[in-house]
């Protein structure tokens, strides 16, 4: 099987397979959409696998640094789990709602997208409420106001009325609650993105790139309350989201020859090795003496808020190698050892919210009970087990509901956080 067979499926536009000699004169038809979609069939487990992996890595990164932190990708390159999460979300959202737009029209697809945006917004508000209660309870019970300052809720305690309004407007967020607001904004833009990609996918990606460049050139950003800006700038991160959508709607298939090229493979490997060396200089300063000063001046700071181009290209290199060496039919995807990751990835909205709650609980235990390496490992592994258990319960409940006559969803990539529902 070629890489072209691994990345996407069939074409839905045009009249492929009709020989010129057999063709009959027909009346002119409206121009077919320019996008392609994978055929509906078996679920794309690679998406679930890496989305689940991203959820686990985000949880570990939200904890105080510990031994397991060294197993997260942010210590070995420029990008981290956030890039994986946003790309897959864009991919799955485009697949689910791109098909809905082609089959049911713009208005129906937009209505479904807005319904999902509302669900994510409600989840964010609910998580915000629970998270504030958790932090406030710990800070009060242990008479340690540093928790409120460290987690960024001091303004809420001083002006709860104003802060709640700002939180509802997505302008005020405690620490570790920046992903869902970003996703809500990106999903609100999805109808326009899909409508544009329906006819001009490459032009849509080019316009997204121009907006990304304009963000850096003109310092575009979303302001936050009480000051500053969003931790993830939607004007910049939309590029990764749109790129994921572009790949889902035929872009990955059109790139199959590039992905199959040995040149692409070796360039990706070389870039990842170079990025790994740069990250080593953060922990072994002596190695920085071997880096050209001009390169350091050009490279730093590697901005996460505006999705630095080094982070974006690092993710592209990782994705290129993943597609090449992890085919869709890889037997390991059926392994029981990977099942916990896949199940978590299939219920990403619920598991992400749970991970934010567990991360602060772990932070509190490490600060108030014990902070040794053994406790760090215990907290990290316990949190992952709880996330897996919750995902299993949700899966079990949905199976029971399906057997009771609920509507069964048969899609390659359930959008979940990205869109489904």
Regions found by a protein language model. Give the residues of each.
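Alpha-helical transmembrane segments and their immediate juxtamembrane cytosolic regions
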Residues: 2-14, 18-421
């Amino acid at each position: 099987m070629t890489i072209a067979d691994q990345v996407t499926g069939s074409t839905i536009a045009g009249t492929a397979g009709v020989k010129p000699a057999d063709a009959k004169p027909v009346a002119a038809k409206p121009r077919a959409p320019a996008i392609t979609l994978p055929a509906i069939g078996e679920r794309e487990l690679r998406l679930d696998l890496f989305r689940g992996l991203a959820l686990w890595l985000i949880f570990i990164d939200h904890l105080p640094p510990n031994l397991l932190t060294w197993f997260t990708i942010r210590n070995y390159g420029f990008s981290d789990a956030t890039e994986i999460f946003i790309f897959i979300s864009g991919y799955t959202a485009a697949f689910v709602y791109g098909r809905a737009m082609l089959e049911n029209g713009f208005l129906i697809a937009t209505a479904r997208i807005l319904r999902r945006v509302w669900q994510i917004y409600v989840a964010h508000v609910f998580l915000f409420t629970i998270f504030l209660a958790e932090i406030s309870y710990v800070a009060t019970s242990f008479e340690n106001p540093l928790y409120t300052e460290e987690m960024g809720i001091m303004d809420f305690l001083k002006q709860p009325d104003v802060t709640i309004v700002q939180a509802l407007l997505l302008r005020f967020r405690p620490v570790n609650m920046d992903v869902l607001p970003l996703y809500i904004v990106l999903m609100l833009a999805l109808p326009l993105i899909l409508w544009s990609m329906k006819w001009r996918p490459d032009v849509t990606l080019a316009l997204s790139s121009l907006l990304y460049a304009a963000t850096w050139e003109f310092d575009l950003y979303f302001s936050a309350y009480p000051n500053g800006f969003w931790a993830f700038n939607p004007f910049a991160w939309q590029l990764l989201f749109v790129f994921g959508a572009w790949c889902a709607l035929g872009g990955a298939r059109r790139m199959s020859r590039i992905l199959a090229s040995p040149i692409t493979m070796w360039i990706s490997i070389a870039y990842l090795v170079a990025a790994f060396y740069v990250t080593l200089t953060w922990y072994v300063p002596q190695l920085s003496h071997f880096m050209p000063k001009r390169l350091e001046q050009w490279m730093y700071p590697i901005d996460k808020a505006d999705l630095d181009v080094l982070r974006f290209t690092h993710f592209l290199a990782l994705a290129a190698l993943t597609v090449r060496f992890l085919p869709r039919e890889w037997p390991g995807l059926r392994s029981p050892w990977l099942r916990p990751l896949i199940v978590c990835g299939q219920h990403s909205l619920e598991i992400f919210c749970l991970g934010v709650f567990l991360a602060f609980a772990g932070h509190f235990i490490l600060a108030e009970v014990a902070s040794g390496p053994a406790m760090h490992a215990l907290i990290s592994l316990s949190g992952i087990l709880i996330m897996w258990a919750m995902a299993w319960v949700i899966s079990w409940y949905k199976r029971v509901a399906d057997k009771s006559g609920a509507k069964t969803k048969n899609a390659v990539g359930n959008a979940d956080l990205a869109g489904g529902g």
